[in-house]
Amino acid sequence: SQRLLYQNITSIQLFPGVESALCAIARRNVAIAVVTSNQLRNVLAVLGEELAGLVSVFECEAGFFTKARKLRSALRQAGVKPGEAVSFGDESRDIEAARKVGIPCAAVTWGYAHSEVLRHHQPDYLLTSVDQIMGIVAE
């Protein structure tokens, strides 16, 4: 249930290196948007106040068929064109949604889906380490 998920959210931690990557992206004055199927309160609980403050746009509770719409909304709110953005995701539907919107997509192998599943969907980038994020952002 949602209540149980919220109660257990304090045990969820960011993957090592994600915090420093978010800080480095923010230092470059790059807008950060979070588009997720999760609820906002859960996202804020995991990020904490400091990291949440680096995020320009939150689009939460994105369903299977609404992720592309939420991505478009996040771009509009951030004032960013699809070709100027990069989507980072850990599921095949993240790749599909980014494609629908025209955003280059980077699939990360340390999350939900197995790397072979992600590779099959042919993302623009397949990242095996958080350290690779800044190389993509710098392009």
How should each PLM-predicted stretch be described?
Residues Y6-V34, L40-L44, A68-R69:
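Short, acidic loop-to-helix structural element flanking the phosphoryl-transfer center
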Residues L22, L54-V55, P82:
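Core-facing hydrophobic residues within beta-strands of well-ordered domains
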Residues V86-T128:
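Acidic, Mg2+-coordinating phosphoryl-transfer loop and its flanking beta/alpha structural elements
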Residues A68-E96:
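Conserved Lys-Pro-Asp/Glu-containing loop-to-beta segment of HAD-superfamily phosphomonoesterases
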Residues Q13-G17, N38-Q39, A62, T66, ...:
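Short beta->alpha linker loops
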